[in-house]
Regions:
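Nucleotide-sugar-dependent glycosyltransferase catalytic domains
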Residues: 2, 30, 37-46, 50-227, ...
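A donor-sugar binding/catalytic signature common to diverse glycosyltransferases
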Residues: 22, 104-106, 282-328
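Nucleotide-activated donor-binding/catalytic signature segment of Leloir-type glycosyltransferases, i.e.
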Residues: 225, 261, 265-282
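Membrane-helix interfacial anchor on the cytosolic side
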Residues: 440-461
Length: 464
């Protein structure tokens, strides 16, 4: 029997995948202590884990501040997490000494979980609730200008805040070492190797176990007419305008529609509903998806994974950079289409496209079979029990960094040659124009070379 400490932030999308893993570990005879928050108590205690409340360490917020949490920046969130870590210092110090965990299983963005595992030198496994991201897979993320600005200008603020941790025994090299996982960190990712972008670029410290779900039900699409399910998740779901457009778009179609709107809006604000459309605050999403023929989704990792697990094709409506990455990958495998126009006509057209073309359903079904062939919660539990795991010795990212150095040298040589040619044959007067022109024309060449190097290294990584 091992003693395992679970840590997570107060978020459904991060907590939910950890619950079946906790249940599996308890069933295997391990003692699990789950440090979380009161809104998750019931779910956690159902797994058999011991629930430890951490609500008193959260900042006190008025109603307006709670509402603004939906729009909080990554910088503000990181600073808040650092301050929560400091508030929890004395409490967790006593807990670690009393419980003496053999392993820490922590959400990837739960600073107090990571930092205390390092501080007390306890083997750590990281729960990754979305894709595993490195310098290759992060190319899938499409950040807004505001998100990019926040990253650039926020790093110095976070670095300054991190220094407040040092007197308490928390030693962090830099911000990235805290928020990102390298190839020597044991990580569980709740998807398959086939669905994970650039999965070959991750060492065997990463275990791709497939979606973490309790349900054993299978897809059952046999109905009198198609069922369309709509949900915007649990965070950015205050979208009455969007739901109204969905209702107007689908009310006259020969389909049934279920909308899960959360508790952010009053259902009555959506007006009188046609007979074929029902609106609920919450539903059993897996059960609905097992019957649904199409899913309009915000593209949270859990929602997309559950949809694919139940072989349901999607209309993608991502709201954040990470959600766009998930949508982009699901579109690549042919399991749906992007909603580029959220007007009434745009929604109607997108739903008809998914329902009329059975290739989307076939692609989703193929992915479903792939997910169900993964090791699942049993594989995750075994991985945690055996932490720390050993590497196979090949560090793909180390090779990528070497290749990137070569790429940068070649890129700038080509750019300089183009600048000289521009100056000799056209004009030296506007050197900045020459520089931009050179950069634009040499970039495609450089990217093609870079992709070729990555492909070569990926073959080496997989032994081909």
């Amino acid at each position: 029997m091992k003693k395992i400490a679970f840590f997570c932030i107060p978020a459904h999308g991060h907590t939910n995948p950890m619950l079946p893993v906790a249940a599996e570990l308890v069933q295997c005879g391990n003692k699990v202590r789950f440090y979380s928050f009161e809104e998750f108590r019931e779910k956690i205690e159902k797994t058999g884990a011991e629930f430890i409340s951490c609500d008193r360490f959260l900042p006190e917020l008025n109603e307006k501040q709670k509402e603004n949490l939906k729009n909080i920046s990554q910088t503000e969130m990181s600073i808040q997490d650092i301050r929560i870590t400091l508030k929890m210092n004395d409490f967790l110090e006593k807990e670690f000494k009393e419980f003496q965990p053999d392993v820490v299983y922590t959400d990837s963005v739960c600073f107090w979980g990571k930092l205390n595992a390092w501080k007390f030198n306890v083997p750590m496994v990281v729960s990754t609730s979305t894709f595993a991201f490195n310098q290759l897979s992060s190319q899938y993320i499409k950040n807004t200008p505001a998100e990019l600005a926040d990253m650039i200008f926020g790093l110095p603020k976070i670095s300054k805040e991190l220094k407040t941790l040092e007197p308490y025994g928390y030693h962090v090299k830099n911000t990235l070492s805290l928020v990102q996982n390298d190839n020597s960190t044991d990580c569980i990712v709740y998807t398959s190797e086939n669905f994970q972008p650039y999965s070959e670029s991750f060492s065997d410290h990463y275990r791709f176990v497939g979606p973490s779900v309790f349900s054993k039900i299978l897809p059952n699409k046999k109905k009198d007419r198609p069922l369309v399910y709509i949900s915007m998740g649990t965070v950015i779901n205050d979208r009455p305008d969007f739901y109204k457009n969905c209702i107007s778009a689908l009310k006259d179609m020969e389909i049934d529609v279920i909308i899960s709107c959360g508790n952010a809006i009053d259902k009555s604000s959506l007006g009188e509903l046609p007979e074929n459309i029902k609106v609920y605050n919450y539903v059993d999403q897996l059960d609905i998806l097992s019957k649904a023929d199409a899913f309009i989704t915000h593209c949270g990792m859990n929602s997309v994974s559950e949809s694919l697990y139940m072989a349901t094709p999607m209309v993608f409506y991502p709201q954040t950079g990470e959600q766009y990455a998930v949508a982009r990958r699901a579109k690549e495998i042919g399991a749906g289409e992007m909603l580029t126009d959220d007007s009434v006509e745009g929604i109607k057209k997108a739903v008809k496209t998914i329902l009329d073309n059975k290739n989307y359903a076939r692609s989703a079904d193929k992915c479903s079979k792939d997910f169900r062939s993964c090791s699942g919660t049993a594989g995750a539990a075994e991985f945690i029990e055996n932490a720390p795991n050993k590497s196979n010795g090949y560090d793909f990212l180390k090779e990528v960094n070497k290749a990137s150095g070569k790429f940068n040298i070649i890129y700038w040589i080509v750019a300089c040659i183009l600048i000289v040619l521009f100056g000799v044959f056209i004009t030296w007067k506007f050197t900045w124009i020459a520089g931009v022109t050179a950069g634009v024309f040499s970039y495609p060449f450089g990217r093609a070379m870079q992709k070729k190097m990555y492909k070569s290294m990926a073959a080496k990584r997989s032994g081909k």
